[in-house]
């Protein structure tokens, strides 16, 4: 359950990077794990099926979905990253998204964000900890 304190931290982080807060932005602040990546991009990773479904059901035009190659048949969290993210943040987001799946940690996978494709291995989930908004 989202606590008032954790929600306040997410709002404070949001306003530091974006002064325009819309209803959809507030909805998204209530969903998923929120990360602030190295170059400042915001990443959101669904915590569970309910989060995944809610994120997909309420599109936010400030974000791009991190997608897997369909033929890889990867099951895991739904993830999004800021549309204005740097290439480095996009690659990190792709690696972190793979970390929250059952994908083999030794194999490479094709991950796409908008029109960019990355062939990468999953990152260790522990790395995500340092980017959580807290």
Regions found by a protein language model. Give the residues of each.
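Nucleotide-activated chemistry modules centered on ATP-dependent adenylation/adenylyltransferase
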Residues: 1-87, 96-105
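Generic C-terminus detector
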Residues: 84-134
């Amino acid at each position: 359950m989202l606590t008032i304190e954790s929600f306040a931290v997410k709002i404070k982080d949001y306003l530091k990077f974006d002064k325009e807060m819309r209803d959809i932005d507030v909805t998204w602040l209530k969903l998923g794990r929120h990360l602030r990546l190295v170059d400042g991009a915001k990443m959101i990773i669904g915590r569970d099926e309910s989060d995944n479904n809610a994120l997909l059901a309420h599109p936010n035009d400030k974000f791009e979905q991190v997608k897997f190659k369909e033929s890889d048949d990867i099951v895991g969290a739904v993830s999004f990253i800021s549309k204005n993210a740097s290439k480095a943040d996009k690659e990190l987001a792709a690696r972190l998204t793979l970390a929250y799946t059952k994908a083999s940690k030794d194999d490479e996978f094709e991950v796409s964000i908008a029109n960019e494709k990355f062939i990468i291995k999953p990152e260790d989930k522990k790395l995500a900890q340092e980017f959580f908004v807290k």
